C-alpha cells in the first residue's frame, strides 16, 4: 500500500502512476477506485492511522486532482471516486455508489442505489452514479437480464451512465445479445 502521507509516495503516484502511465498515454478518464482502506496498524510517514482513517479518502482525491490539474491535458481529463469524507468535494466532484450486488436485494443490490445517491447528494455531490448491473457476484449471486435492463433504465436518468461487467463476467448476463444491445442503445439515447 502506498503511504499517502509520504511526499515521495505522493510524487510517485502523481508523476508515474497517473501522469506518465495514464494521462501521457492518452487516458481521458478513469475511476480513482478505493482510497478508503487504511489499516489501523499501518506505519505512516506522518500521522496516526487511527486518526488519519477518515482523512485518507480526501488525501486520495486530492492527489488525483492535483495530478490531473497539473497535466497539460488536465482540463480534458475526468475522474471519479467512491470514497470520501468532509472536504473531499473540493477534489472529486463525481462520485459513484461503490460495489453493489448483482441482484434486487434492498440493502446491497440495485434498490440501495437510490438512497445512497440521495445521501451523497445531501453530502454535496451533484453527480452520482452506479455500476449499471452491479458488480459483486459470487456463488449463486448471478446477474439476470431483467436486472441489467432495469438498472440500465434507472441509470439512463443519472448524470453518468456506465456499465460494468462484474467480477465474474463469464457467468453474468452481459449487454451483448441483440435484444439487450437495442435496449441499451435506446436508453443511451435517452441519457444523452
Language model features with spans:
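Catalytic-domain carbohydrate-binding cleft regions of carbohydrate-active enzymes
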Residues: 1-192
Amino acid at each position: 500500500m502506498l503511504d499517502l502521507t509520504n511526499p515521495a509516495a505522493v510524487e510517485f503516484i502523481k508523476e508515474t502512476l497517473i501522469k506518465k502511465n495514464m494521462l501521457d498515454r492518452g487516458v481521458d478518464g478513469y475511476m480513482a477506485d478505493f482510497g478508503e482502506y487504511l489499516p489501523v496498524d499501518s506505519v505512516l510517514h506522518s500521522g496516526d492511522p487511527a486518526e488519519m482513517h477518515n482523512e485518507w479518502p480526501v488525501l486520495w482525491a486530492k492527489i488525483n486532482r492535483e495530478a490531473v490539474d497539473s497535466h497539460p491535458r488536465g482540463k480534458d481529463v475526468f475522474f471519479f471516486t467512491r470514497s470520501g469524507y468532509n472536504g473531499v468535494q473540493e477534489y472529486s466532484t463525481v462520485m459513484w455508489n461503490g460495489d453493489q450486488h448483482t441482484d434486487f436485494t434492498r440493502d446491497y443490490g440495485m434498490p440501495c442505489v437510490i438512497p445512497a445517491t440521495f445521501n451523497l447528494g445531501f453530502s454535496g455531490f451533484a453527480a452520482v452514479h452506479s455500476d449499471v448491473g452491479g458488480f459483486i457476484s459470487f456463488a449463486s449471486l448471478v446477474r439476470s437480464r431483467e436486472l441489467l435492463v432495469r438498472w440500465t433504465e434507472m441509470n439512463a436518468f443519472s448524470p453518468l451512465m456506465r456499465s460494468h461487467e462484474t467480477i465474474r463476467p463469464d457467468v453474468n448476463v452481459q449487454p451483448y445479445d441483440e435484444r439487450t444491445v437495442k435496449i441499451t442503445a435506446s436508453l443511451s439515447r435517452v441519457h444523452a
